[in-house]
Amino acid sequence: MASSFPALQFKVVARCSTTRARVTDIQLPHGLVESPVFMPVGTQASLKGVLPEQLDALGCKIMLNNTYHLGLKPGQEVLDTVGGAHRFQSWNKNILTDSGGFQMVSLLKLATITEDGVTFLSPRDGTPMLLTPEHSISLQNSIGSDIMMQLDDVVHTLTESKRMEEAMYRSIRWLDRCIQAHKRPETQNLFCIIQGGLDKRLREICCREMVKRNTPGIAVGGLSGGEEKHAFCETVYTCTSILPDNKPRYLMGVGYAEDLVVCVALGMDMFDCVYPTRTARFGNALTRKGVINLRNQKFRNDIGPLEEGCSCPCCKTELEGGWGITRAYFNSLVSKETVGANLMTIHNVHFQLQLMRDMRESIIKDEFPSFVKNFFHEWNHGDKSNYPSWAVDALRMVNIDLLA
């Protein structure tokens, strides 16, 4: 299946014959993105502690920027003057921006939502400000992101049903306003966002209504907010059962390794999360055998790499063209020197990107079920009793039995 829009061409390259996993090509204005793909989050037009050329060298083809933060600083006028966020941050690959609505509600006190938009108090001087669908799109047009998100009515997944239904229908109406306000469809893609909490009926209604609007891509939002994981997976499964096959599917805010593997199996293509970079700043390294905390003094004299066999520049030896950094060196740096956070972030982002590359390769070879089983075996050190029940149940929905 394929689809074509002025700023996005989409093609399914390969499918898993057992699950809903697939490999796709997403051609965007700043280059080709191959999915499944993980998108690192550069909140304020930078990945904390990492240079654009370092991120590029890791093979990253698309990153996130935050509309709310860029709207505050440097501000829309500066973005217009400099020619958008790509030039502002010296990043010549793709950018996806959120709408700013989530930050309004989650980060700011006394935010209120009406049909007009989100009213909040300015963090600068405390004066009331209103973010409307039109203003969100205007900001994202100034940012120049390759993919921009509609403003949606964001509520917690456990919100009572009447408010959840109101938010779902309002998100549909706000999408219509976003489409009307979008000035640059020839160079920027507007994605809709499926809402509805954990309510299957609301999710189904929202999927069908959003699909009618024919946006270049579709996101599933309102999850990964602390809800029970079985319900999370069932909601993802519900959405991928309905969403069209010929458009990219973006699951917002998901980035734990186990979640990525399961949700690729359930049929999602694109993912983002601050977790890999944020946890790096606390001294935590992501490996195929789980997360290791380099602050632990048992690593004080460990001269091995973060992960044996890892091809990131931190773990590769100097003879292999890397930096040959040891666990002992990380132990001496973490929480003390900014270079430690920089190096750990590079490793963790590489881990995420390599995980997605490995999944793509296994799907193309039609060996994805074996990959999934091997991943959980290694992640849990071969102990099936440690396999999370939510993952076992979710994968059974797509014909993988982890316990067999």
From Swiss-Prot:
Binding site for substrate: D98, S99, G100, G101, F102, D152, Q195, G222
Keyword Protein biosynthesis listed: no
Keyword tRNA processing in annotation: yes
Record's subcellular location: Cytoplasm; Nucleus
Chain spans, region RNA binding: 253-259, 277-281
GO biological process per UniProt: tRNA-guanine transglycosylation
EC number in record: 2.4.2.64
GO cellular component term, pick one: nucleus
Active site: D98, D272
Reaction catalysis annotation: guanosine(34) in tRNA + queuine = queuosine(34) in tRNA + guanine
PANTHER family membership: QUEUINE TRNA-RIBOSYLTRANSFERASE CATALYTIC SUBUNIT 1
Family recorded in the similarity comment: Belongs to the queuine tRNA-ribosyltransferase family.
Protein name: Queuine tRNA-ribosyltransferase catalytic subunit
Organism annotation: Schizosaccharomyces pombe (strain 972 / ATCC 24843) (Fission yeast)
